[in-house]
Amino acid sequence: MDRLDFMQACREGGRAIERALRALDAAYFDVLFREGLRTLRDTEAARDAVQETFIKVWRRCSTFQAQSELLPWIRAILRNDMLDRMRRNNRELSLEDDAVSVEAERRIDELSSQAIA
């Protein structure tokens, strides 16, 4: 599928965009999945990122510009999705680290109290 066909499908909507997305999936899934796997290092996370990317392609198809190429545009969406995922994971890891630190401090206080007593 070329960019003009994609733009036409976006304008038509409905089944046309569904067919376009299936064609894009068939053409680009493997490339996008490998990029996702290389970045995220997790099969399920990479698969989820690619699926989410195609959902975003569908939602944002009206923003695609004629002078752009499809694959770089889709890859940019994927990269942004992966960055968001990594930020969320870092926040979750940071919160877990904070919880461990609080627990460690509590335990140190207990042991200090026992040593003094």
Give a label for each model feature.
Residues 3, 25, 33, 43-60:
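Conserved RNAP core-binding helix
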Residues 1-31, 38:
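N-terminal module of bacterial RNA polymerase sigma factors
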Residues 59-66, 76-96, 109-110:
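Arg/Lys-rich amphipathic alpha helix in sigma70-family domain 2
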Residues 14, 38-41, 52-69, 88-90:
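Sigma70-family region 2
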Residues 21-29, 75, 113, 117:
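Amphipathic, non-transmembrane alpha-helical scaffold segments
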Residues 48-55, 68-80:
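Structural recognition of an alpha-helix C-terminal capping motif at a helix-to-coil junction
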Residues 1-6, 84, 91-117:
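Internal acidic/polar
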